[in-house]
């Protein structure tokens, strides 16, 4: 399982790279894209954990 620190590092790297090359398009299979998606999923699960357990 990917640690949240590596997700945060990936997001920070993308943010730093985005400011340097704002027009760069990443492919869907790029690891940085996958790390951001995973970070969003983890954040959503944490925010709605009680709702998930209620089902």
From Swiss-Prot:
Annotated signal sequence range: 1-20
UniProt keyword terms in alphabetical order: Signal
InterPro entries assigned: SRP1_TIP1, Yeast_SRP1/TIP1_CWP
Family: Belongs to the SRP1/TIP1 family. Seripauperin subfamily.
Name of the protein: Seripauperin-7
Organism: Saccharomyces cerevisiae (strain ATCC 204508 / S288c) (Baker's yeast)
Gene behind the chain: PAU7
């Amino acid at each position: 399982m990917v640690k949240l620190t590596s997700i945060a590092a990936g997001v920070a790297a993308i943010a730093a790279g985005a400011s340097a090359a704002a027009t760069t398009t990443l492919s869907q299979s790029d690891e940085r894209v996958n790390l951001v998606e995973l970070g969003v999923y983890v954040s959503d699960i944490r925010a709605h954990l009680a709702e998930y357990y209620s089902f």
